[in-house]
Amino acid sequence: MKFTFKGGIHPYEGKELTEEKDVIDYLPQGDMVYPLSQHIGAPAKPIVKKGDRVLAGQLIAEAAGFVSANIHASVSGTVKTIEPRLTSSGSKVNSIIIENDKQYETLAYTPNDKPLDELTREEVIDAIQKAGIVGMGGAGFPTHVKLSPKNLDDIDFIIVNASECEPYLTSDYRRIIDDSDKVIEGLRIVLAIFPNAQGIIAVEDNKPKAIKLLQDKLAGDARIRVNAMPTKYPEGAERQLIFANTGRYINSSMLPADAGCIVHNVDTVYAICEAVREGKPLTERLVTVSGDAIKNPCNIRMKIGTNYQELIDCAEGFSKDPAKLVAGGPMMGKAIYTTDIPATKSSSAILALSEDAVAEMEPSACIRCGRCIEVCPGRVMPNKLATLAARNDIDAFVKNNGMECCECGCCSYVCPARRHLTQMIAGTRKLVLANKKK
């Protein structure tokens, strides 16, 4: 098996800026902001009020239903207010603001050292749900929901997505290098509740140290294998990852579980280990702060709720005026206009790019070269879909498989006419999904 997929691109990686640097531990100094919607599903409900004193690890907002997630304080301090605050999505979200007392007093956690074969499904799911763990690769889907398919016996593969195919991002790589034991234990905990499943850790072959480290530690483990995949973007996209590692194809109407797979990010399985083994809630994560406009690009172990500007200052600030600020990776991240934004559970990176790294070019007419079709991993025709989107022809857009687009950005990247193909298609997809909810 070749562990790859049709299409894709090879953009500048930029990982050399941070991949071999030690992770920096950062304790925040300013107010902490906790948006009540850091996940897919219903926003969490605050259970604290203005003036309450809280400790790090304390529950401050509880899940509002099954498809939702708990939120915990990551520092000790006093609840200042609950009000809408700007997030990296560009929208204002109701948020709990805590005045950081800089004491970092933490609740006592209850560890669980039961052997894997004695862990019950109920206690694993309960620990994950109480810890507020969500997918940390970007989507933010509540993990306890993902681990609750209709039939456990139908799940054949638990895949840890360690591809980290976005340029500049190296936090997952550092997590494997520095904390591989917890990553492996987190996967083994998940496998313990899926009796028929095999484990796969999928890593791109531009990370030979991580591959060798995992292979050495998993030597003799018949239930987990490490797949070294050819480096190509978007190898880490869920549908492409599943196809590359299992040969199974899923479309936009399916969930990975429909193909017998569950996919987790590296940081997610690490958090599962900490929740089950240490009783620790999700209050921190690794984030990459990088780009050619950052003075000291690095990975930071930060408290969730920390202000973006504090994290940039931790990386010694800007080395030059940034022309573009991005929350997440340069291909699928969100452009932001301010650094007064809180880091959330799904914050993987903050990028600051100078004019030299950002191409500002006016789009022109399609020249019908077909490059966008060649690189599209979703097997659709981006040029045609973008034209239908521009015409607002939603019926034809759906009929021509517009909903199969994963918004990876490959088409926009290669387009010689510099058409904003991904953005045009994404806008229409959003409209279709909104109409379905009515």
Regions found by a protein language model. Give the residues of each.
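Flanking helices and flexible, charged tails adjoining ferredoxin-like Fe-S electron-transfer domains
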Residues: 101-132, 137, 168-169, 247, ...
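Hydrophobic alpha-helical positions that pack around
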Residues: 196-308, 314-319, 329
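Ferredoxin-type iron-sulfur electron-transfer modules in oxidoreductases and energy-metabolism complexes
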Residues: 347-363, 373, 377-438
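Short, well-structured beta-strand-loop connectors
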Residues: 49-62, 81
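Conserved hydrophobic positions within beta-strands
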Residues: 77-79
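Gly-rich Lys/Arg/Thr-decorated short loops/hinges at beta-loop-alpha junctions or inter-strand turns
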Residues: 106, 135, 158-172, 293
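N-terminal, Lys/Arg-enriched amphipathic/low-complexity engagement segments
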Residues: 1-47
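Histidine-anchored nucleotide/phosphate-binding helix
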Residues: 177-192
